[in-house]
């Protein structure tokens, strides 16, 4: 699962700061000028952070606990979860928010774990559709709730800054699993709670 950008600097096929310098030179820049001198190191550090999700295990994030709250069997929804990721097609950022809802079946997770789950998958090269499904499938697999719903709203810089150039356009994706697919009332309740705040 783990595919880090940088591993052992002694390996000739490992990506290094020198490769970032070559990119700057390829773009027609002087990599030794003052403003760019430290850029390769900064970019290397930034990409390690932006792709740190490859080093995280979703199963570890979603450890369940028992404190009496697991008796709760109504819909739990967390919305406004920040999403920051990079499109695998152009390496351009996309960002927005996620809403996650689930109906417990004797197991619950801490609310912060849902935010960490989103961050785990967002800090990988992604497409929004897959990101949405990965979050829903992982929650269903490891927590085994009665239902799961995920809605993600994002702006994509690959569309806003190049190509069709549509500033402010938002892409919305959703994944509904378990009773969320068959129970119309439950689905409508989740989708209503997942709507953007006025």
UniProtKB/Swiss-Prot annotation:
Pfam families referenced in this protein's UniProt entry, alphabetically: GTP_cyclohydroI
Protein name in the entry: GTP cyclohydrolase 1
Source domain of life: Bacteria
Alphabetical UniProt keywords: Hydrolase, Metal-binding, One-carbon metabolism, Zinc
Family: Belongs to the GTP cyclohydrolase I family.
Recorded name of the encoding gene: folE
SUPFAM superfamilies documented for this protein: Tetrahydrobiopterin biosynthesis enzymes-like
GO biological process terms held by the UniProt record: one-carbon metabolic process; tetrahydrobiopterin biosynthetic process; tetrahydrofolate biosynthetic process
NCBIfam families listed in its UniProt record: folE, PRK09347.1-2, PRK09347.1-3
Catalytic activity, EC: 3.5.4.16
């Amino acid at each position: 699962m783990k595919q880090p950008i940088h591993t052992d600097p002694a390996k000739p096929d490992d990506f290094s700061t020198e490769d970032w310098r070559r990119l700057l030179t390829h773009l027609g820049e002087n990599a030794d000028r003052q403003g760019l001198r430290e850029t390769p190191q900064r970019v290397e550090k930034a990409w390690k952070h932006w792709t740190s999700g490859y080093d995280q295990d979703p199963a570890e994030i979603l450890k369940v606990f028992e404190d009496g709250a697991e008796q709760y069997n109504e819909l739990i929804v967390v919305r406004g979860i920040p999403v920051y990721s990079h499109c695998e097609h152009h390496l351009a950022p996309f960002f927005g928010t996620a809403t996650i809802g689930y109906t417990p079946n004797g197991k619950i997770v801490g609310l912060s774990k849902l935010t960490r789950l989103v961050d785990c998958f967002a800090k990988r090269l992604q497409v929004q559709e897959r990101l949405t499904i990965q979050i829903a499938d992982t929650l269903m697999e490891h927590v085994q709730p009665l239902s799961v719903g995920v809605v993600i709203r994002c702006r994509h810089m690959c569309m806003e800054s190049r190509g069709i150039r549509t500033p402010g356009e938002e892409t919305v994706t959703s994944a509904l699993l378990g009773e969320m697919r068959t129970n119309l009332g439950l689905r409508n309740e989740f989708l209503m709670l997942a709507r953007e705040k006025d």
